[in-house]
Amino acid sequence: MLFFPFPISHFPFPIYSLKSEIRKQVLARRDALSAVARKSCSSLITKRLLVLDAYRSANCVMAYATFGSEFETGDFIADLLAHGKKLVLPRVERGSRVLTLHEVQDPRLQLEAGVWGIPQPRADLCPVVPASQLEFVLVPGVAFTARCERLGYGGGFYDRFIGGLASRPALIAAAYSVQVVPELPISESDQRVERVVTESAEYRHTA
């Protein structure tokens, strides 16, 4: 459990301070998982993702390359490529505040270390894909609630990306159960996901 001496709604400091503290605590819990535990949990999460109707019917899927102790996306990506789906991965140019979307056919050969060392598509090898083609988006994040509220890494990239979509694809987050918290401080610009999938449960946002 996160430790706060009083409810989030009564937190006496700016919201960004609270978000920063939650990130710190949740990332520490995630990082404390052993490699074996992360692999096992990731396998269970992947199995849940692959049977979702939204995934099975999608032809164009946006995912992300795993960084640090995140959910391991490798098996999910391998499955979508094996089934002939278009794989889209995000790219961030240094100094930019937006994600650009690129089709990746072979992650082993077409990725490079980007900003903060996160693997991303090589712009010279991977064509740009318009967001309008996306049917399923796997959304990363640090913390989530059972109401599908999301806390990202602090850059606002996915909040801006999701908020700017003209039409909404399925927005699905994959996370370990240690990343699910009772509540999160929410700003006007924060974007929910449609579903949060963990190794032991699934949570859906209902309007």
Protein language model features and the residues they cover:
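Proline-centered helix-kink/hinge sites
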Residues: P7-S9, P90, P140, P185
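N-terminal active-site beta-alpha-beta segment that forms phosphate/nucleotide-binding
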Residues: I15-Q133
